[in-house]
UniProtKB/Swiss-Prot annotation:
Probably involved in E site tRNA release. Binds directly to 23S rRNA. HAMAP family: Ribosomal_uL1_A (MF_01318_A). Keywords: Repressor, Ribonucleoprotein, Ribosomal protein, RNA-binding, rRNA-binding, Translation regulation, tRNA-binding. This is Large ribosomal subunit protein uL1. The lineage of its organism: Archaea, Methanobacteriati, Methanobacteriota, Methanomada group, Methanococci. GO terms for molecular function: rRNA binding; structural constituent of ribosome; tRNA binding. InterPro entries: Ribosomal_uL1, Ribosomal_uL1-like, Ribosomal_uL1/biogenesis, Ribosomal_uL1_3-a/b-sand, Ribosomal_uL1_arc, Ribosomal_uL1_CS.
Amino acid sequence: MDRENILKAVKEARSLAKPRNFTQSLDLIINLKELDLSRPENRLKEQVVLPNGRGKEPKIAVIAKGDLAAQAEEMGLTVIRQDELEELGKNKKMAKKIANEHDFFIAQADMMPLVGKTLGPVLGPRGKMPQPVPANANLTPLVERLKKTVLINTRDKPLFHVLVGNEKMSDEELAENIEAILNTVSRKYEKGLYHVKSAYTKLTMGPPAQIEK
């Protein structure tokens, strides 16, 4: 899938979508083929840093106490303290809600054993296990990187869709972001993009435009 075909699909996705009174996101949808996804090694569970950013702020939760929790609060991030974490371990419905509402999790390293017991069963299958950091960490560099990161997680289904930007970004920026996802798929499998059956891109409220191979 070369840049020209990706650009063509991005332009088509724009033209197919009606204008809305909000900024629409652009998604990439990829259908895979000839992969046994009952085998965990064939599943895609990757974080990809998009060269031109997500075009949409991710929701980040920080599991911490003391100074690290205070730093996260100052940054406007969701903070989950130890007592709340223990409560989430008893309330699976609330744990799932937290997991679904947040894109990424960061955890104070010495709290990871408790995270594993309480939120692990919910975050693990979603590919959202927290990134551990020391209690004295500066969260800014990590948060800035996560603001440009998307998560691919096929689980056992031969398709995934992932955010690659928004309609305010240029066609070139969106195409570069799509290439970053395709390169990740290519590196994962020995036969590379052969395993991509089809790929589409679409704006939030628009129909999909196929990326020709």
